Amino acid sequence: MSKLRVAIIFGGKSTEHQVSLQSAKNIINELDRTKFDLCLIGINEQGQWHEYAEDNYLINSDNPSTISLSQPLRPVAIIPGSTRQQFISLTDGQPLAQIDVVFPIVHGAYGEDGTLQGLLHMIDMPYVGPNIMSSAACMDKDITKRLLDDAGLAVAPFITLMAHQLNDISYNEVVEQLGLPLFIKPANLGSSVGISKVNNEAEFNAALSMAFEYDLKVIIESAIVGREIECAVLGNEEPEVSPCGEIVLNDAFYAYNTKYIDDDGAKVVVPADLDNAISLHIRQTALKAYQVLNCLGMSRVDVFLTEDNQVIINEINTLPGFTNISMYPKLWQSTGLDYQSLITKLIELALEHHKKTAVLKTKCEL
């Protein structure tokens, strides 16, 4: 049986560029080479696409704060069509070797928001993870919250503010509605980039200014006091949910540095120390959220568990990290599903979903 050729797309013009490089490194290292050949497509911080050699694609690969792309082989682009040869070398105009499936691990803007998924959909390419709509809906915290709330799932009380509305709302009005402390977040970023905890008016104004440097839409939400619990979900029509894991913080909140730089900022506990009934309730909530947002392939569902055992959904991450400290693979490893088998399963799910969509009609038969 011939091997499938997998393109790993990583990097990106995003605040999460370095996180993507860390995730890609682990996926590349763990890919089952008895089943898959490999093509590496890196996107630099200017948004340019290049093919990279496996033995020379990263610089400072073991340092999360300085990891970067190395010297590429050649620039590449995608052209319309559906022949599996849509990745073209811009050096000589020739197609790269046939690619059968893509594993996009571009975190954040342009990779997790439906943009890259739309491009791959246009060339009829199977890809790991959710479709365009699910990606976009889960990336936008405002839309995510509205859809979950409509489905009867609890979310933190929040206000959405657009950049042009900055002068239409006051600190006192927000505090009257949401209380203190608050969190202010760019609506369309991940990895806790641009997020601030607010306890007073000066912090409120500074937090809004910073958040609007990253996005034209901002979420202001009540701070929820509770344990931070995460579940991994895997599958298409019949998804499975992992045991619960817990983030135990030493810092004020789970910020970017806490996640990826500071080894002492937080501790990951798998499985979380929870009563069986509470654990089941959290897992059922994660599954419902996954299905409400029509997710495919994988997602990590993050919730707060309050003192009185309320489960409040924080966010749904459709392309969770695969870094050394990432919760998603750790949760599945706790069930006996090792890293390599998880990656293989995700690729199989991508091919399975594409096979079902490929037979759908694309023209009207009168």
From Swiss-Prot:
Its cofactor is Mg(2+); Mn(2+). Pathway: Cell wall biogenesis; peptidoglycan biosynthesis. GO terms for biological process: cell wall organization; peptidoglycan biosynthetic process; regulation of cell shape. Keywords: ATP-binding, Cell shape, Cell wall biogenesis/degradation, Cytoplasm, Ligase, Magnesium, Manganese, Metal-binding, Nucleotide-binding, Peptidoglycan synthesis. It comes from Proteus mirabilis (strain HI4320). This is D-alanine--D-alanine ligase. Mg(2+) 2 binds at E315, N317. It catalyses: 2 D-alanine + ATP = D-alanyl-D-alanine + ADP + phosphate + H(+).
